């Protein structure tokens, strides 16, 4: 029976990497389980590359890309792909943007034709642009009807003092309204150049024929001068912060952050392990303590946000607002226990198994595997770092988790956000509560 390590080593060994003369990086994985393909063209530019006045332009470009090129009408793009049994989609993150086509293997050539055209020769029709701006603005308004979205947008703004992750990917109404066709073309010309892109193909395809098609559609794409972006150093907060959003909701929502790691940092896998131990399901420490033992929360979970830039460790859930103060106290005590006493071998081994199992499971489909390869290539610079991640998880020790928890779980850098019908306490009470913590080793 194959071990998880063997599975990942086999996966990495089968990837073919090639760089075209124009600088485009190509990753191909021969996915032989089914006659399917995922073709993903990713650009290393996300919302964090925008200036304040450009907030939302990356996302708006993503919306506009499928709206027609110099030679193709909108119906010649999505409609053609769907007629061949496939589908198209795209997403914008803080760090990169991806456009993809998925479907039967027979769709590959058409996917190359369409993606190379829409990404390099979009028309950005002014009438269509005005219509799409309204769609995006409506999307903004709908998002703010979601309590967690509202909570996290405010939390990100408070958690980052300088780094552009503090802005929502979708942008702001005033910036989106201001964009003209020339603005989109200018931004695209600064970043949409082959050496700033990765083409990922995962499918049941013959290698020689595939690279011949890639050369046909991508080798002559124009080189553009890549704009250099300098990112600010993030200072994070030096004192506990509190944001309270008052809305007529039936239950209370909470979300906390502490400084985290970049995915390029050696500590990132250890924070994933800590997240699994603290908030990964009903056997996690926070669930057992705050839900099962004390019944303070309705739901609770954690996640480690490890992007290209500085990350965050996040704890969030729902609860009766009357319990908010006690929730902060109990969460911080659980974090302090790990700093003082670590975790058990059983907890660590269970977290390792869960993370690697989820990691492998998410890479079993052609689309999932293209996402895995893409994220490692774009954030860490090489898809082969899948093996770095696997090794870091497998060899992590209790001492590693104690060291990392001491480094990142500083309650003085806690940012707390609540959403409820009314405010229950001020930031001074939060600071007093943190000052009075008395953790006891478990």
How would you describe each model-predicted region?
Residues 3-36:
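N- or domain-start disorder-to-order transition segments that initiate the globular core
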Residues 10-12, 239, 400:
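Residues that act as N-cap/strand-start positions at coil-to-secondary-structure junctions
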Residues 12, 35, 95-96, 250, ...:
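Short acidic/glycine-enriched loop/turn segments that link adjacent beta-strands
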Residues 16, 25, 252-256, 311-313, ...:
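Short beta-strand micro-motifs in enzyme catalytic cores
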Residues 19, 76-226, 233, 244, ...:
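Charge-rich, well-structured scaffold segments of protease-associated domains
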Residues 23, 32-81, 256, 266-278, ...:
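Active/ligand-binding-proximal structured segments within catalytic/core domains
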Residues 25, 46, 86, 261-262:
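Short beta-turn/strand-loop junction motif enriched in small, turn-promoting residues
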Residues 31, 40-42, 226-285, 392, ...:
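His/Glu-based metal-binding/catalytic segments typifying zinc-dependent metallopeptidases
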């Amino acid at each position: 029976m194959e071990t998880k390590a063997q599975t990942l080593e086999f996966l990495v060994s089968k990837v073919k990497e090639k760089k075209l003369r124009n600088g485009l990086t190509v990753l191909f994985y021969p996915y032989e389980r089914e006659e399917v393909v995922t073709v993903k063209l990713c650009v290393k530019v996300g919302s964090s590359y925008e200036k304040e006045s450009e907030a939302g332009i990356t996302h708006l470009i993503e919306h506009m890309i499928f709206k027609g090129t110099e030679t193709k009408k909108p119906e010649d793009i999505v409609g053609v792909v769907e007629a061949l049994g496939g589908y198209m989609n795209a997403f914008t993150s803080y760090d990169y943007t991806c456009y993809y086509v998925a479907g039967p293997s027979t769709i590959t050539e058409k996917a190359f034709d369409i993606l190379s055209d829409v990404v390099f020769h979009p028309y950005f029709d002014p009438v269509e642009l005005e219509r799409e701006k309204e769609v995006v603005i409506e999307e903004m308004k709908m998002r703010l009807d979601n309590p967690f979205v509202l909570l996290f947008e405010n939390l990100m703004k408070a958690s980052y003092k300088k780094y552009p992750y503090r802005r929502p990917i979708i942008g702001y109404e005033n910036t989106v309204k201001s964009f003209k066709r020339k603005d989109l073309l200018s931004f695209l010309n600064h970043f949409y150049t082959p050496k700033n892109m990765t083409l990922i193909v995962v499918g049941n395809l013959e290698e020689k024929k595939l690279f011949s098609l890639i050369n046909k559609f991508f080798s002559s794409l124009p080189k553009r001068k890549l704009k250099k972006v300098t990112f600010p150093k993030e200072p994070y907060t030096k004192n506990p912060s509190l944001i309270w959003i008052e809305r007529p909701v039936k239950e209370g929502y909470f979300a906390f952050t502490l400084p985290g790691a970049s995915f390029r940092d050696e500590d990132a896998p250890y924070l994933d392990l800590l997240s699994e131990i603290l908030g990964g399901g009903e056997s996690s420490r926070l669930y057992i303590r705050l839900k099962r033992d004390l019944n303070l929360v309705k739901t609770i979970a954690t996640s480690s946000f490890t992007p290209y830039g500085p990350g965050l460790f996040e704890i969030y859930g729902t609860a009766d607002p009357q319990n908010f103060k006690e929730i902060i106290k109990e969460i911080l005590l659980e974090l302090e226990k790990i700093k003082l006493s670590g975790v058990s071998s059983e907890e660590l081994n269970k977290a390792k198994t869960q993370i690697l199992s989820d990691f492998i499971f998410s890479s079993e489909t052609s689309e999932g595997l293209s996402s895995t390869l893409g994220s490692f290539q774009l954030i860490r610079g090489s898809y082969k770092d899948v093996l770095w991640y696997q090794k870091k998880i497998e060899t992590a020790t209790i001492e590693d988790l104690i060291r990392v928890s001491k480094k990142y779980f500083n309650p003085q850098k806690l940012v707390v956000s609540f959403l409820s019908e009314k405010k229950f306490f001020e930031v001074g009470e939060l600071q007093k509560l943190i000052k009075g913590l008395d953790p006891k080793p478990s």
